[in-house]
Amino acid sequence: MNFSDPTLLILLGLAALGIISHNNIVTVAILVLLIIRLTPMEQYFPWVEKQGLTIGIIILTIGVMAPIASGTLSASTVLHSFLHWKSLLAIVIGVAVSWLGGRGVSLMSSQPSVVAGLLVGTVLGVALFRGVPVGPLIAAGLLSLLVGNT
């Protein structure tokens, strides 16, 4: 391992931040990336970069939808949610956040220079404030409202 490699130093620093903050999500994610980077699996980084976000969103969606699929959250409970103001507000906010995420994807594609800042900010938010790493898309969406998509 070449400790003068800036990329490795950044990853090690982020892993340390995850460990210090007791955030297993950051720690495991960074350690997996380090393993990929330091082994012959490094050849799969283009695939991980291209498909990782999609796979992550699929897994996140499975986790969110599991209570409905398992029956823990009954159909009647779901239907009754349309009658409560908090649930209706949650629906509106869900639509807004999804829209922001879409803007975020566009911004990250059209202005790749902002990606590093968004990623570092998200990792810091996860590590220091016990957030969850869904932030880059939403952060990019919010940023797109301020700076535009192009």
UniProtKB/Swiss-Prot annotation:
TM annotation in the entry: 16-36, 53-73, 82-102, 114-134
Membrane topology term: Multi-pass membrane protein
Cell compartment(s), UniProt: Cell membrane
UniProt keywords, alphabetically: Cell membrane, Membrane, Transmembrane, Transmembrane helix
InterPro entries listed in its UniProt record: UPF0756_TM
One GO cellular component, as annotated: plasma membrane
The keyword tRNA processing is annotated on this UniProt entry: no
Main subcellular location: membrane
Family of the protein in this entry: Belongs to the UPF0756 family.
Name under which the protein is recorded: UPF0756 membrane protein SG1722
Species, as recorded: Sodalis glossinidius (strain morsitans)
